[in-house]
Amino acid sequence: MSNVNTGSLSVDNKKFWATVESSEHSFEVPIYAETLDEALELAEWQYVPAGFEVTRVRPCVAPK
């Protein structure tokens, strides 16, 4: 019997790019989240306490 059950824990995360800045450098880091707002929250939660500023979050667009 082959019964595939994705269950309620199945999440469709998307890739976003967060621009993170310090006083000397700026770099982009990947963030995986369901929405743009959630990606911003995750980026701020992860990088602001470490002394960085999150200046931009954008969706990852696959090249055509």
Swiss-Prot record:
Gene Ontology biological process terms from the UniProt entry: symbiont-mediated suppression of host gene expression; symbiont-mediated suppression of host transcription
InterPro entries recorded: RNA_pol_inhibitor (IPR016412), RNA_pol_inhibitor_sf (IPR038715)
Keywords on record: Bacterial host gene expression shutoff by virus, Bacterial host transcription shutoff by virus, Host gene expression shutoff by virus, Host-virus interaction
Pfam families documented for this protein: RNA_pol_inhib
Keyword Cell cycle appears in the UniProt entry: no
Function: Acts as an inhibitor of bacterial RNA polymerase by interacting with RpoC subunit and thus preventing promoter recognition by RpoE. Non-DNA-binding transcription factor that plays a role in the transcriptional switch that abolishes transcription of the viral early genes (class I) by the host RNA polymerase but allows transcription of late genes (class II and class III) by T7 RNA polymerase.
Subunit structure: Interacts with host RpoC; this interaction inhibits host RNA polymerase activity.
Listed name of the protein: Bacterial RNA polymerase inhibitor
